[in-house]
Structures are given as structure tokens and as C-alpha cells.
Amino acid sequence: MKEVIVAKSAGFCFGVQRAVDTVYNQCGGKNVFTYGPIIHNEEVVKDLENKGVHVINSADEINDDSTVIIRSHGVSKDVYDSLHEKNVNIVDATCPFVLKIHKIVKEESANGSQIVIIGNENHPEVEGIMGWSLSDTYVIDTSEKAQNLVLDSQRRVCIVSQTTFNYNKFKELVEIIEKKSYDVSVLNTICNATEVRQTEARKVAQCSDVMIVIGDRHSSNTQKLFEICKNECKNTYYIQTSDEMAVSYTHLTL
């Protein structure tokens, strides 16, 4: 008899749900925008667009009487400054865990530490984190980059992580850097919800014939979960919409 298991941790995390609720609460207002997609979920962004909430990528795109909601991934200090100069109403939906990283990076870099961010340099969360550093900042996401990383041995090094980075990969890259004998301070800033999801996904995949990972193609969270599940279960499928589910179902091998 076939059994369908739904992960207990499935669904939006606290930070994402908070951001989405924040935007929906602003729906119906005049000139409401999000700075970048509020979350990496195309279906949600489309629904908000239909409700009159538009996405911008620059303060130059709006007028002074606008309401701008900061995306869950956060933005750089320069973006905040540009919005304040426009005299707009700013609603900050940045995930609190991301805001914590901004504070860490700002304080550590102000004290002279070199900043190493473990994450995807092209991800908006990482771009935002970089924008709070006042010192030399480096981004790595592979063993090769960690091996080739050369830092000033006379200065402290502060290591933080993108909140959705693979936890096991984070530990691997930290170990490589620590072997270089720098004065390193490691702050595991991977969100607890990310660790819980990744751990549960791995365990469920190990005992399943088929895994279906549902989420947006641009979501770092979903991409990492897919990679983890695929390593444990060859029949792992990445689904964004119900239409894709119907197509993938024909390929399921139980």
C-alpha cells in the first residue's frame, strides 16, 4: 500500500510568512511597491501584482507618496538611504534573522574584521549583507573558493552564512578556512528553520521511493532541499505548480 508523507516542516518559514502577510496587509493602499520580489515565489508575486502591488528595483522608479515594502531577503544600507532620500513610507519586511546578520557584519567590520560570507554571491540576501560591511568582504560557496581564499593574517576574520545555505556544506567550508590558521570567529547564521527542513528532508528521502519538492525555481531554500533529497532518493522531482505535478506524475516509478 502506497503512503504519502508530508514533511512536518513543509510550508513557509516564519520570516517568509511574516513578509507575505505584511504585503497583503498593505494591499488596497495607494502606490504600494515591494523592493524586489517580496519572496522567491512567482505565484505569490503574481497574485500581489494582480492586487496592485508592484515590484521595483530602484528608488528612481517611485514617487514621494509611495509605500515601499522591503523584501524578506533584505537590502543594502545604500538602498535604505536612497529610499529615505525619496521621503517614502518604508515598511521593512526583512526577515529578523537576516537583520541580525546585517547588524553582525556592520559591527564586526567596523571593528576591523574581514568579513567572509558563505553563500551565493548573486542571491539578493547575500548582496544585501555585503552592503552592510565597512571592511573587506569575501563571498564563497565552494570548496575550491575556500581553498583559494587568501586573507590578511594580521586581522581578525568573521564568518557568517546566508540563512538558507546547506548546513553540512557550511561546516565543510568553515573547516577549510580554519585550517589556514587565521584568527577566525564563526557565526552560524543559517536559520534554524532551514536546518530543520534540511534534516527532515534528508531523513524522509532516505526512506522514500519518490520525493516531490514543491517550491519556486528561484528559491534558494527549495533548491537546497531538492539537492539534498536528490542525493538520497533518485526519484526526486522539483515542482512549482500543480500543472507540473500532473506531468511529473506520469514519470513516477513506484
Language-model segments: which ranges?
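Active-site loop-to-helix "anion-binding N-cap" substructures in soluble metabolic enzymes
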Residues: 2-134, 138-150, 167, 172-178, ...
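Long, charged amphipathic helices and adjacent flexible linkers at domain junctions
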Residues: 187-193
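Conserved small/polar residues in nucleotide/adenosyl-binding loops
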Residues: 250-254
